Every structure is written in C-alpha cells, then in structure tokens.
Amino acid sequence: MVLSIKKKEQIVCKIQEVFKISSSAVIASLSNITSNSMNQLRKESRDCGVYIKVIPNTLLRRALKNSLYECLSNFCIGQNIIAFSINNPSDAARVLVNFSKNNEYFKIAGAVCEGNFIDKDQIDMLSRLPNYNESLLQLILILKVMSVGKLINVLKILSNQIIEE
C-alpha cells in the first residue's frame, strides 16, 4: 500500500506526539512473527497501557530525528515494531520481554528510558522493575514490618524494666 505524503506526515507527527508523552520506548524485530502472535501482543500491550506501532523505517527515522529517542534510529533495519510506555517506564519492556519468551524469532534490539539508551542485555533488568502499584505495596510492607519490629522492641524493653523492679 502506497501512502501519500500527507498521510506519511500525519504518521510522523503522531509518533512524535507519542514520544513527548512516553517515558520509554523499546524497538524489536518482527521477522517471522505470525499475525495471531501479533494480535496477542497487541492485546497484551493494550491491557498494560503500552502503545505499539509497526511503522516503515524511513518514517520512524524521521520521527526519531531530534528527539530523546534518536539513538534508536540505528536499529531501523528490516521489519520493526516500536513500543512506548506511557505510565511506567518498564511496561513496554515487560510486555516485549514476555512476548519474546514465547516467540523465538522475536528479537528486542534496544530501548531508551528517560533519554538513556539501554542495550538488549539490560532490557531484562528494566522489565523486572516494579510498577507504581507494586512499589507502593513494597513500601507499605516495609513500613508495616518496621512498625511491628519497633513495637516488639518497646514491649521487650518494658518487660525487662518490669522484671528488674
């Protein structure tokens, strides 16, 4: 399908708008991926609040130019997909890493998180970062354990004082 120049400009503008509101982006190779697998990936990404787009490389390079994500233009070779995390920086990495575990041909090329390039070896680490709700839960559990520990220490001190008297 041949796109008109106006349609191409609209695609580039839309991707640039997504760049402005996203906290991270991950690019991956799509060769030998079935349409059913792609539909599954789209469903998972929608559920996690991740915006994914298959876009021609020349248009992607134009959209990447003069942005925080410009270093990803080196990976615009072959058929690619780009995923954007809108809410949590690790969401896109988490969705694509989980998808790559079930699809041997799906290869993650690189990512950018808040302006810093992350190579494919470190993307697993990014995908394991807790999201906002998980972080809050961990903080609450730590505070809860600390307060119970303090209460036990106070009770132990009081019991020692009572025994001494």
From Swiss-Prot:
One of its GO terms (biological process) is translation. CDD domains: Ribosomal_L10. Keywords: Ribonucleoprotein, Ribosomal protein, RNA-binding, rRNA-binding. Signal peptide: none annotated. It holds the Pfam family Ribosomal_L10. GO terms for molecular function: large ribosomal subunit rRNA binding. Transmembrane segments: none annotated. InterPro entries: Ribosomal_uL10 (IPR001790), Ribosomal_uL10-like_sf (IPR043141), Ribosomal_uL10_bac (IPR022973), Ribosomal_uL10_bac_type (IPR047865). GO terms for cellular component: ribonucleoprotein complex; ribosome. Part of the ribosomal stalk of the 50S ribosomal subunit. The N-terminus interacts with L11 and the large rRNA to form the base of the stalk. The C-terminus forms an elongated spine to which L12 dimers bind in a sequential fashion forming a multimeric L10(L12)X complex. Belongs to the universal ribosomal protein uL10 family. Forms part of the ribosomal stalk, playing a central role in the interaction of the ribosome with GTP-bound translation factors. This is Large ribosomal subunit protein uL10. The lineage of its organism: Bacteria, Pseudomonadati, Pseudomonadota, Gammaproteobacteria, Enterobacterales.
